[in-house]
């Protein structure tokens, strides 16, 4: 995975197809996944991570090699790895959390406790 994580053919969709092709091959024993990304789309990150988890469920080892940087979604897609290798100068860290606040004004008939 090189660059910002995006959806679409040039982004996560293409990477997912490559991972799927590897884990659907019965001769595959391991997937070495190179990450050089500051992150990006949470949906794209989740798609790639899910595909790596599918490979792990098939007893395929997942090995991540981090390049110049692996942050946010780049770290998140690395979490299924059995092994993670990084360069001494790799900048890595911070899995961000998305938050969508709920609108409870429209909830009728609910009993609310006050704190």
PLM ranges: what are they?
Residues 1-60, 69-115:
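Small-residue-centered hinge/linker elements
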